Swiss-Prot record:
Top EC class, one word: transferase
Any single Pfam family the record assigns to this protein: GCV_T_C
Name the record gives this protein: Aminomethyltransferase
Miscellaneous notes: Was identified as a high-confidence drug target.
Functional note: The glycine cleavage system catalyzes the degradation of glycine.
Keyword Transferase: yes
NCBIfam families: gcvT, PRK00389.1
Entry EC number(s): 2.1.2.10
Gene Ontology cellular-component terms listed: cytosol; glycine cleavage complex; peptidoglycan-based cell wall
Molecular function as annotated in GO: aminomethyltransferase activity; transaminase activity
Family, similarity comment: Belongs to the GcvT family.
Amino acid sequence: MSDVPELIHGPLEDRHRELGASFAEFGGWLMPVSYAGTVSEHNATRTAVGLFDVSHLGKALVRGPGAAQFVNSALTNDLGRIGPGKAQYTLCCTESGGVIDDLIAYYVSDDEIFLVPNAANTAAVVGALQAAAPGGLSITNLHRSYAVLAVQGPCSTDVLTALGLPTEMDYMGYADASYSGVPVRVCRTGYTGEHGYELLPPWESAGVVFDALLAAVSAAGGEPAGLGARDTLRTEMGYPLHGHELSLDISPLQARCGWAVGWRKDAFFGRAALLAEKAAGPRRLLRGLRMVGRGVLRPGLAVLVGDETVGVTTSGTFSPTLQVGIGLALIDSDAGIEDGQQINVDVRGRAVECQVVCPPFVAVKTR
């Protein structure tokens, strides 16, 4: 018997294979990485619209009297700033200030909060909440109860309108609707930096919604897009990916996610540690790197000033939009590195020149 855990298969795998997708493991799931090619899918999303199957994302439900109050006492962001029909980016931390996961919390009612964590961390988030929950609250892992389909790009509203789905929500708002008898939660969220939506139909009915979206996306000049393009798109925005820019060893402050912490709240997981880190100043900070010459950055490369190592890359890719190599790196705060400064990255023993920049690398168009 193999000790390697079997990969989880999404509800739309057969459709992806018919579309010619290539697949890879991500977060324990077998997911489509590309169809026509990552660059083509990336550019289609920036200029028209891309359709992503991100059903590997987690889903969980906190339900019972005072569910919102409990979630607000556990996760970092201030849930009291939103209400029903709104969603919020937030983090689930350890008591030492590390990040178990970053996730989206959907405020359904005072007694019901729907969560979308990352694929590999869903069980850990559910477990942390269950361990702290008072009696009368249920925290349920619904990972394979819903699919998640992302429609991203400047033509995304046209696509949803063609299906008769709601589009009028503000950024981070959501509405419950239906398509052809299938209930769908439609959210004004995304991970690309473009105007877009994420749709959550039931797992078993996802194909009906996907087929209709694909036809409308094609009519709008777009194409299906895989996780390869999703990664290049999020890297251009400087968005963190758990396991790269956030982890049990990388705090929200180090990843420049302090804006997602409700510092005035009385309680959240890791509050004391994060307040202490905020007072002292984080020892390292996430920065952007833009290559001066040719090449591609990858995670885990040393960032150098002269012969001194001052940081490490966390993500890197070729930017189809800018036609240059870009990356993200954690750089020591006491190194005194300023935006615009030239540094080097050790790429296979060769010092490659990069410019330190403040992400995003391209303009944000989410709103």
